[in-house]
């Protein structure tokens, strides 16, 4: 493998505006049922009474997540046709001419990255905009973020710059697939496995 690329996600900056998601959909010409990049909204808290005085501990934060181009991708392991594969540059992609649309990859991926495109009759997913990267450009989601909450580059450089945190609630633990992401947590971020909050927009992710 030449260089493993990855994403840095700054949850302290992300406002959940979905510009990255819409830019991706426009660039990839995706229908309403498919979104390669999705915004997770995690929220929780309640009101508590203390001697007649009410206090709140309500919180919410956002995570912009696409395919994490994992070191140990679950999707490639279950693909019966070999359509889902990891390139030399680390991008996990699907060969749409080989894919049979069985959806095993979608069921295996803990992030739901591979998505079935009913119009095309096969699986589709984020490819890291590898054609843009080859031209020295940034992925369209990174380029479009108005808050500069996304960053892209060789994952080791991102880890040296931003640390190694790769999971907060509601994401799964990182050891399952070894995702190539780095997360800067929001001040309200909860650890993976947290039960004090909930995914506030499940139909969108």
UniProtKB/Swiss-Prot annotation:
Residues forming coiled coils: none
GO CC annotation: oxidoreductase complex
Alphabetically ordered keywords of this record: 4Fe-4S, Electron transport, Iron, Iron-sulfur, Metal-binding, Repeat, Transport
Pfam families per record: Fer4_11 (PF13247), Fer4_2 (PF12797)
Cofactor(s) the protein requires to work: [4Fe-4S] cluster
Residues engaged in binding [4Fe-4S] cluster 3: 67, 70, 75, 109
CDD domains, per database record: DMSOR_beta_like (cd16371)
Region of interest (Disordered), ranges: 183-205
Annotated positions binding [4Fe-4S] cluster 2: 24, 126, 129, 141
Keyword GTP-binding in annotation: no
Family matches, as PANTHER family: ANAEROBIC DIMETHYL SULFOXIDE REDUCTASE CHAIN B-RELATED, PROTEIN NRFC
Source species of the chain: Escherichia coli (strain K12)
Domain 4Fe-4S ferredoxin-type span(s) in chain numbering: 5-33, 59-89, 90-119
Protein name: Probable anaerobic dimethyl sulfoxide reductase chain YnfG
Record note on cofactor: Binds 4 [4Fe-4S] clusters.
Subunit structure: The complex consists of three subunits: YnfF, the reductase; YnfG, an electron transfer protein, and YnfH, a membrane anchor protein.
Residues annotated for [4Fe-4S] cluster 4 binding in this entry: 79, 99, 102, 105
Binding annotation for [4Fe-4S] cluster 1: 14, 17, 20, 145
Function in brief: Electron transfer subunit of the terminal reductase during anaerobic growth on various sulfoxide and N-oxide compounds.
Bias (Polar residues): 186-195
């Amino acid at each position: 493998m030449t260089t493993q690329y990855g994403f840095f996600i700054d949850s302290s900056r992300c406002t959940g505006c979905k510009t990255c998601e819409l830019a991706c959909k426009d660039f990839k010409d995706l229908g309403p049922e498919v979104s390669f990049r999705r915004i997770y909204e995690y929220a929780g808290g309640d009101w508590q009474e203390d001697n007649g005085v009410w206090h709140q501990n309500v919180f919410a934060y956002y995570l912009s997540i696409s395919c994490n181009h994992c070191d140990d991708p679950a999707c490639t392991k279950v693909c019966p046709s070999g359509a889902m594969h990891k390139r030399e540059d680390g991008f996990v992609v699907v060969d749409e001419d080989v894919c049979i649309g069985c959806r095993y990859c979608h069921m295996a991926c803990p992030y739901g990255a591979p998505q079935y495109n009913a119009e095309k009759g096969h699986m589709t997913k984020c490819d890291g905009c590898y054609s843009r990267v080859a031209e020295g450009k940034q992925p369209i989601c990174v380029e479009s973020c108005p808050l500069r909450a996304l960053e892209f580059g060789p994952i080791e450089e991102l880890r040296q710059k931003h640390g190694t945190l790769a999971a907060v609630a509601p994401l799964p633990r990182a050891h399952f697939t070894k995702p190539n992401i780095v997360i800067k947590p929001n001040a309200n971020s909860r650890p993976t496995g947290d039960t004090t909050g909930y995914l506030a927009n499940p139909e969108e992710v």
